[in-house]
Amino acid sequence: MTSWRLRSKKLTGTVCPMEPPRVAGTVCPMAVFLIRHAKAGSRSAWTESDSTRPLSTDGEAQARAIADGWSHGAPVAVFSSPRLRCVQTVQPLADRFGLAVAIEPMVEEDTPFEHALRVIEDAPDGTVFASHGDVIPEVVDALIRRGMTITGSAGGLRKGAMFVLHREDGRFARCDYVAPPQ
């Protein structure tokens, strides 16, 4: 089995076989979920602070699809970057399970990945994080350097994609890449 290497939002390597699908409604053991925010409006066309740039219509549909298609059991907590597009990405999921979206500045865009990595490693199993295309690849790269492997499609870190991080012996050992809803 070849490990993946994540660079510049692109996965490279050999596809590893996926484990069998999980049964809906069961808690995914030993897993933390990293979701890249869904499709947002154009950065160049947005005239206000980038922190308030919302999801596009397609992004709103992606966020609903993430929540509607969730088959990993009830999350224990949902955290988001302070950026509106991240909050909007996981709000439908939080609503589905009766949770509030908690703001976590350590997973915000342009934050040193070491801060995000620390928060993610300390998170209890079943925690969901919404973050950005600059943070998630750095976190995953750091975990790969520590021996974590990735299974799943080599579709890259597209908006709305998710990494499911599985722990073994207290460390993240395996990661499933889940392509974004279309």
Regions found by a protein language model. Name each.
Residues 75, 172-173:
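A broad structural signal for short, well-ordered beta-strand segments within beta-sheet-rich domains
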Residues 10-11, 20, 61:
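Intrinsic disorder/low-complexity segments enriched in polar/small residues
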Residues 175-182:
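Short, solvent-exposed aromatic-acidic interface loops
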Residues 14-16, 26-27:
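Long, intrinsically disordered low-complexity tandem-repeat segments
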Residues 30-114, 137, 148-153, 157-160, ...:
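Active-site-proximal alpha-helix that buttresses catalytic centers in soluble enzyme cores
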Residues 22-30:
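Extreme N-terminus of proteins, especially the signal/transit-peptide cleavage junction
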Residues 114, 118-172:
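Active-site-adjacent alpha-helix immediately C-terminal to a catalytic or transition-state-stabilizing loop
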Residues 2-8, 16, 22:
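Low-acidity, Ser/Thr- and Arg-rich intrinsically disordered low-complexity segments
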